[in-house]
Amino acid sequence: MPICSLQTFADALPPGRPVLGLDLGTRTIGVATSDVRLTLATPIITIKRRKFTLDVQELFALADGRAAAGLVLGLPVEMDGSEGPRCQATRAFARNLLALRDLPVLLWDERLSTAAVNRFLVGEADMTRARRAEVVDRAAAAYILQGALDALDRQRPEQAF
């Protein structure tokens, strides 16, 4: 399956299974999960990056353990909307991952996600710099995933209660 549009991603997801959100960095990968109703993102772990094959093995183990139906990868678009080297690296990561496993992958604009998470962790959670460094990547993954989940929710038809 190629990298999906939002609609294709939504159509490819089976009901009752979560998705994982990833914040890819050069040294770490922040990972978050959704609930099975695809409404709430929760940070779960930060993976220290090693080699691609080892990183993907760990991601696949997490996905399998949670029965995840797809992946949302943060796409680090520049502020002017252009795609720089980090976007190219994220797209390459997604293509290489898809060469190993066929699953829905959505690239989601992550502009300012880490900055927003840092502001929250400093202002609201009153975390020290050391503690923030431990959680910022997985919290950014949850922020990215929540944005995608909210967009998926807006695409669903209204249901009468």
UniProtKB/Swiss-Prot annotation:
Subcellular location: Cytoplasm
Location (main, coarse): cytoplasm
Single GO term (MF): nuclease activity
A GO cellular component annotation in the UniProt record: cytosol
Known EC number: 3.1.-.-
SMART domains in the cross-refs: YqgFc
Coiled coil: none
InterPro entries given in the database record: RNaseH-like_sf, YqgF, YqgF/RNaseH-like_dom, YqgF/RNaseH-like_dom_sf
Keywords for this protein: Cytoplasm, Hydrolase, Nuclease, Ribosome biogenesis
SUPFAM superfamilies hit by this protein: Ribonuclease H-like
Gene3D superfamilies per the UniProt record, alphabetical: YqgF/RNase H-like domain
GO biological process, one term: rRNA 5'-end processing
Similarity comment: Belongs to the YqgF nuclease family.
Family matches, as HAMAP family: Nuclease_YqgF
Role description: Could be a nuclease involved in processing of the 5'-end of pre-16S rRNA.
Protein name: Putative pre-16S rRNA nuclease
